Amino acid sequence: MKNKYDFKLVEEKRNEKWQKKGFFIAPKQTKKPFSIISPPPNVTGQLHLGHSWNAFIQDSLVRYHKLQGFDVLLLPSVDHAGIATQVKVEEDLAKKGIKKSDLKREEFIKKCYHWKEKQYLKIKEQWDKLGICYDFSKERFTLDQDAQIAVSDFFIKLWEKNLIYRGQKAINWDIKLQTAISNIEVINKPVEQKMYYLKYFLENSNEFLTVATTRIETISSDVALAINPKDKRYLHLVGKKVVHPLTKKLIIIIADSNVSSDFGSGIMKVSAHSILDFEIMEKHNLESKDCIDNYGNLNHEVPEFQGQNRFFARDLIAKKLEKEGFLAKIETVISNVGFSQRSDEIVEILKKPQWFVKMDELAKSLISHLNSKDKIKFYPKNFEKNLRKWFEKIHDWTISRQLWWGHRIPVWCKNDEFKVQIDSPGQGWIQDEDVLDTWFSSGISAFAFLGWPQNFDLIKSYFPTSLLVTGWDILFFWVARMYFSSLFIMKQKPFEKVLLHGLIRDEIGRKMSKSLGNGLDPMEIIEKYGSDTLRQALIFNSSPGKDIKFNIEKLNTAWNLNNKIWNIAKYIADLDTFFAKPDLIDLWMENKIYILKRQIVKNIKKYNFSVIGTEINNFIYGDFSSRYIELIKTRKNGFYARKLLRKVLIILHPFLPFLTDFLMEKIFKMEILEQKMPRIRQFKENQKVENILEIIDNLRTYREKFQISKKIILEYCIINDKFSNAEIDIINKLTFGKWLENKELVIKTKNFEIAIKVPEELKKEQKGRELKEIQFLKSEILRAEKILTNKGFLEKAPREKIDLERTKLEKLKEKLVFYEKK
């Protein structure tokens, strides 16, 4: 073995070996399963640190359970990522001078599949470097043939239960991507903008009402003014009419409980392009009129501004209203604006025909399950409350997307008639042009990836899956949808437990992103430090629900631990191996291994990986390296030490798979993944070994404190206890000491009194230091006496300061007497 840990030597082709040997191919039938369906990364780019963290957690848990005797399944998959992939492919085509509109739908889809294959190969290479134990015989793609059958079947089953409908409703519209998006794909951000205070004159009156709005561009779609029915200031105006500032038409004043009396003047203009406004219009039977088109431009409702960009038109409309006396004032405010998570474009609210999932019944089913004993266990627990709150206020889900790449909606149209089925009903029937929301297809992955609705072999063995590991940021996007979809189709929960981790941030707490330039490529880290080092740096700083502040120091710490394990293994491997029974030191060490294993088992159940990391670090640096290895240096036989090392390697394997596999193969000529988690005997705490260690620690501390060279033999004895010659021999060898009866200098430790004969060299040094101290004390006494005999000081200084100087002088004199007596 090399003198220094070389991760490239250790990790080279190791995952390839695991795959070839089929260590992680899950049997179709099992009585003791542990299964995880891995969150599918998008086929739009490379894996980032967050993907690596997630994959490492899953992999470590699967390896741990395999060593515990479970049949394990870690199922890999990738997501077609509808909007994101289509954008990437369009950008790629644009570089070649090709527009999407230049291609037929089938041609564009082929381009998308080609992109997917190219990207998937990159992702698989990255998984290989990470060392993830996927069962590639069962890999899935959210748009593969089986997935298409499953998604269509799911849609049809929802339709048959009247849980899917097509309706003309206010939806979130991404004007850049030209598609509808769901509510949770809208991200609110604080934006500085203008608040316009508009005058609405009462019919046949010089009196006016002031209405505050940030969206002056929607004024042409105003159909009413609304006040809160509890607002006494305006209640007498309900039913009256006001003059529209722009069109000069009359619009009515209504009362609605959704109006906030605290916002602006407490009067709200009811117009298109707001979900709340649409709800009020429906309730009061008011006709809605869009004034903004699909591209974010003003339409024909106001010919004067037709074709103008919605935001540019704000100033034009404001100037016109100011000129005509309808603008009271303008203020600058900070308010939340909805942005598309996909394109980062400001979302527009448009009324459009779309496909929706009715969520009331599905939400009630999920909440009911959360109230049962069979509910999914969330780690940390507070995310269950978050999920419950979200479902208590949920809206219907917009599932249609105006894209080409994705699952086609299984609906066929002919004139005004439509049919919901997978295959075409016949001649003249045209399939709906839209595709389904990506989360609609990934929302059934918990059971569809296991074969539903065509093959139930894996479902019988591995469903519900044991665990889902994912980031808390997709709790509502993905976890929630798998939950209610599984309850609807399978009549049971999709997984037993959900472990939610946080986000990876930089060392000052910022989210890693391309725009900030603070992102780190996991493959570059692996190239420099190795996969095991990156795994450690992420997993051993991981707690449920918590973010990680990542920095290079974490990598250095992890690499040092790997190097320490390497050095321990190399030392033990070089020892003689003739048979020998374990001595007290070996049994003491075995007990320490038992304690380590117990701590890992305890904390892995709670997914407290940071605690496991601390326990492993303390064990390796403390018990194994500084204690056990030091103690066995007094002998040359490593027969039992090798047995202990083998157990430690198996215990550490889930967290350091490459290194432990290499060492097991190199030293023991065995495959670590063919082993079982070792049974370790528990012994009573071996007090004799603890006593030896206590003496060694204190003698070493004494030597370090006074910087006594190892060339000088430290003479000592234990006053209040007896040690055997063999025990004294161990202490002597590890402290460069010698037993000598004396009572010169007595050190009291936790359990002992150690008498040390002070070396002559130290006495000389100590005498020199004492003489210097005496000289210093005399000069300080002289200074203090001079101050206290100074009349000016005594007359002007505060009493407290004078008393302080006198106290100081007394202490200096006492100290001088002490040193002069010595």
From Swiss-Prot:
It holds the Pfam family tRNA-synt_1. Its EC number is 6.1.1.9. SUPFAM superfamilies: Anticodon-binding domain of a subclass of class I aminoacyl-tRNA synthetases (SSF47323), Nucleotidylyl transferase (SSF52374), tRNA-binding arm (SSF46589), ValRS/IleRS/LeuRS editing domain (SSF50677). It catalyses: tRNA(Val) + L-valine + ATP = L-valyl-tRNA(Val) + AMP + diphosphate. Keywords: Aminoacyl-tRNA synthetase, ATP-binding, Coiled coil, Cytoplasm, Ligase, Nucleotide-binding, Protein biosynthesis. ATP binds at residue 514. It is found in: Cytoplasm. Transmembrane segments: none annotated. GO terms for biological process: valyl-tRNA aminoacylation. PROSITE patterns: AA_TRNA_LIGASE_I. Residues 765-822 form a coiled coil. A motif ('HIGH' region) lies at residues 41-51. Signal peptide: none annotated. GO terms for cellular component: cytosol. One of its GO terms (molecular function) is valine-tRNA ligase activity. A motif ('KMSKS' region) lies at residues 511-515. The keyword Cell cycle does not apply. The keyword Cell inner membrane does not apply. Monomer. ValRS has two distinct active sites: one for aminoacylation and one for editing. The misactivated threonine is translocated from the active site to the editing site. Belongs to the class-I aminoacyl-tRNA synthetase family. ValS type 1 subfamily. Catalyzes the attachment of valine to tRNA(Val). As ValRS can inadvertently accommodate and process structurally similar amino acids such as threonine, to avoid such errors, it has a 'posttransfer' editing activity that hydrolyzes mischarged Thr-tRNA(Val) in a tRNA-dependent manner. This is Valine--tRNA ligase. It comes from Mesomycoplasma hyopneumoniae (strain J / ATCC 25934 / NCTC 10110) (Mycoplasma hyopneumoniae).
